[in-house]
From Swiss-Prot:
Gene giving rise to this polypeptide: ATG7
Organism this protein belongs to: Gibberella zeae (strain ATCC MYA-4620 / CBS 123657 / FGSC 9075 / NRRL 31084 / PH-1)
Name assigned to this protein: Ubiquitin-like modifier-activating enzyme ATG7
Highest rank taxon of the organism: Eukaryota
One GO MF term: Atg8 activating enzyme activity
Active site residues per record: C550 (glycyl thioester intermediate)
Keyword Phosphoprotein: no
Subunit structure comment from the entry: Homodimer. Interacts with ATG8 through a thioester bond between Cys-550 and the C-terminal 'Gly-116' of ATG8 and with ATG12 through a thioester bond between Cys-550 and the C-terminal 'Gly-160' of ATG12. Also interacts with ATG3.
InterPro entries reported in the protein's UniProt record: Atg7, Atg7_N, Atg7_N_1, Atg7_N_2, ThiF/MoeB/HesA, ThiF_NAD_FAD-bd, Ubiquitin-activating_enz
GO biological process terms on file: autophagosome assembly; autophagy of mitochondrion; cellular response to nitrogen starvation; piecemeal microautophagy of the nucleus; protein modification by small protein conjugation; protein transport
Length: 694
């Protein structure tokens, strides 16, 4: 008694890059959308080892979203059309109606067979589905493959021994199949018709000796209904499929759905099947198997109802269950860190801030002038936002009082005189995250009110600072003294850079962005750190006691100010006008509206002043001052015109900046006005002559 056909099931073989692609797709594009999307599988004839049988490959580029960008498959590999549904939670994975999901996939194959559209996409006969859940935080992927197979009823059985072709027959067949595959769509290559035709092909060279009494002709499946087998003896007719099975006489999984088509469309109950296992490179080895199969007679060859569908894959232990892979075990630690750093940021775009432009923030090159308390906290917050380029400038060394307040340093950094702060801060950032591009420069920023003693050294520091400012997008002023911020303020504004500033008191802080030279129409330009001064900066360290020389603040003030400063920068970067963004005008009791309304992060204030003594914070909008010692047009024009000559004169001549900016003239006018004030007596304060008012 003939036994029913047995089929070798597909086994999934997933390349590691596919997991990375799925990870990126979920994080950057799909987000909360867990609808099914296309995925491409590939299979091919394999070597004779049973463990390599019926491997369905999922390559790194397998995710497809449409025909325009579908990856092409090599000529020797066959397409399998798949879909993947990557759900949002593990509970969704467990609760998915898997039988219904399989039936839906099976119905797609069945409907294509019924309406004939299968002829355009025969690769649908080898279709598959993937249900998956990607744990983006732990880099674990849970998945379950299904290869929907429509059951034949009655079943097909072998009706004779397996046959094999001769070496000459195989060589001729491989040549014809290869030629045919070049002429058809990639989706048709896995299934075809073959027939033996006596004599030589008309296109063959008549002078070439004919080794076979026949030649092969190959046709697409649709050719069956247009007379491909007309006038061909039954024993010379073959239906064929590319067989990934390596078992001697057990065909691969693609034949199962093909048999439904053979009955319903071809209306056959007996046929010869070529399990095509040959390759061009070894076409003389004759590996293909020919099976003669038949099914019990039936009254009606039409199948009225969709056949039963099975196909959920078994795990390596033979059980019907999902599989899991821990991608973290295979990923390079540096690459793992890259993905993890951006995870929380990209999750913001899923629901909370879909308009957030993370690339703008990531690509902003930041120069931090000062690698102390503010510099440490600012750099960590910048890294939290995904900024990759952070450069430190500081002339100091790590002292024993630093590590408890400055989180980039530790006790060992204080030994042997202390490591240079800027260089050690850059190293610390790389220890935290190797993917950051961080460097440190030990140079002294020339300060107003501090005449130089070594012109060559001071000029070199100035030129190095100028180069660094030109190379970066955002300049952070995080130094200890007021006068050290003056030159970077001038240089940053002259270069058109974003300048961010934070300054601390014992229990207060100011966080601000310096105004740009240009401003939106109808808006007054915003001021800088020095716009409220009535005198030019001078040496603030002279004749000060130790408690005045050190930055004596409540320990929580620096982290608060640093965080606000970085948040202010990111809000500024999200504004369509960038550094030229206007600031809202504070109104008592009124919360300003977002400008523009779709701004991803909200307001972009000019200044934020906070007081920890009262735990209050206020937002201020300050106008630029045309006599400002740092950002007034006279100062900027002089700097642009003379560069180092201007800086040299400002450092050496005490009153130069005040005279040039106009502050000195303002002071003189104020003194003149005070001298001409006519102080009149108030009659209410004059006594009646009986005594003196003390």
């Amino acid at each position: 008694m003939a036994k029913p056909l047995q089929f070798a099931p597909f086994i999934s073989e997933i390349e590691l890059p596919f997991y990375s692609a799925l990870f990126a797709s979920k994080l950057d594009h799909d987000k909360l959308d867990d609808s099914a999307r296309s995925v491409l599988g590939l299979y091919e004839p394999r070597s004779e080892e049973p463990e390599s049988s019926c491997r369905l490959q999922i390559l790194g580029n397998a995710l497809t979203s449409g025909k325009t960008n579908e990856p092409s498959s090599p000529l020797a590999t066959m397409r399998a059309e798949g879909i993947i549904r990557n759900v949002n939670t593990l509970e969704d994975f467990k609760n998915t109606d898997k039988p219904a999901m399989l039936r839906t996939a099976g119905r797609q194959v069945w409907d294509a067979i019924k309406d004939g559209s299968i002829y355009s996409v025969p690769s649908l006969l080898s279709s598959f589905i993937i249900l998956s859940y990607a744990d983006l935080k732990k880099y674990k992927f849970t998945y379950w493959f299904a290869f929907p197979a429509l059951h034949s009823d009655p079943v097909w059985k072998r009706s004779g021994p397996a046959e094999r072709l001769t070496s000459q027959e195989t060589t001729a067949l491989v040549d014809r199949v290869g030629t045919w595959r070049y002429s058809v769509d990639a989706r048709e290559r896995g299934f075809f018709l073959a027939k033996k035709v006596p004599g030589r092909r008309e296109t063959d060279d008549p002078d070439t000796p004919q080794e076979l009494p026949f030649h092969w002709e190959i046709g697409s499946l649709r050719d069956f209904e247009t007379g491909f087998f007309d006038q061909v003896p039954e024993e010379d007719r073959y239906v064929a499929f590319t067989d990934p099975s390596t078992y001697p006489e057990a065909p691969g999984w693609p034949l199962r759905n093909f048999l439904i088509l053979i009955r319903h469309r071809f209306r056959l109950t007996k046929t010869k099947v070529i399990c095509y296992r040959d390759t061009w490179a070894k076409r003389h080895e004759a590996k293909s198997v020919i099976l003669t199969i038949e099914m019990d007679p039936v009254e009606n060859l039409d199948i009225t109802e969709m056949p039963k569908v099975t196909g959920w894959a078994r795990s390596s232990n033979g059980k019907l269950q999902a599989q899991q892979v821990n991608l973290g075990e295979y990923m390079d630690p540096a690459r793992l860190a890259d993905s993890s750093v951006d995870l929380n940021l990209k999750l913001m775009k899923w629901r909370i801030a879909p308009n957030l432009n993370l690339e703008t923030i990531k690509n902003t090159k930041c120069l931090l002038l000062g690698a102390g308390t503010l510099g440490s906290y600012v750099s960590r917050n910048l890294m939290g936002w995904g900024v990759r380029k952070i450069t430190f400038v500081d002339y100091g060394r790590v002292s024993f009082s630093n590590p408890v307040r400055q989180p980039l340093f530790n006790f060992n950094d204080c030994l042997e005189g202390g490591k240079p702060k800027a260089l050690r801060a850059a190293e610390a950032l790389k220890e935290i995250y190797p993917g950051v591009d961080s460097e440190g420069h030990a140079l002294s920023v020339p300060m107003l009110g501090h005449p130089f003693t070594d012109e060559t050294k001071t000029k070199e520091d100035y030129q190095k600072l100028e180069k660094l400012i030109n190379e970066h997008d955002a300049i952070f002023l995080l130094m200890d003294s007021r006068e050290s911020r003056w030159l970077p303020t001038v240089m940053g504004k002259a270069a058109g850079k974003i300048v961010m500033n934070a300054a601390l008191g014992f229990d207060s802080y100011v966080v601000m962005r310096h105004g740009a030279e240009t401003s939106p129409e109808g808006q007054t330009p915003l001021g800088c750190y020095f716009c409220n001064d009535v005198v030019a900066p001078a040496d603030s360290q002279k004749d000060q006691t130790l408690d005045q020389q050190c930055t004596v603040t409540r320990p929580g003030v620096a982290p608060i100010a640093s965080a606000l400063l970085v948040e202010l920068l990111t809000s500024l970067l999200q504004h369509p006008l960038g550094k030229d963004a206007p600031a809202p005008q504070p109104t008592s009791g009124v919360i300003p509206e977002r400008d523009p309304p779709d701004h991803a992060l909200g307001l972009v204030p000019h200044q934020i002043r906070g007081y920890t003594s009262t735990f209050q914070q206020i937002v201020i909008r300050g106008q630029s001052y045309d006599c400002c010692s740092a950002c007034s047009p006279k100062i900027l024009n002089a700097y642009r015109h003379d560069g180092w000559g201007f800086v040299k004169r400002a450092l050496q001549e005490k009153e130069y900046v005040a005279e040039l900016s106009g502050l000195a003239e303002v002071q003189r006018r104020a003194e003149e006005m005070a001298a001409h004030v006519d102080w009149e007596e108030d009659d209410d304060l004059v006594d009646d002559g009986e005594g003196e008012l003390i």
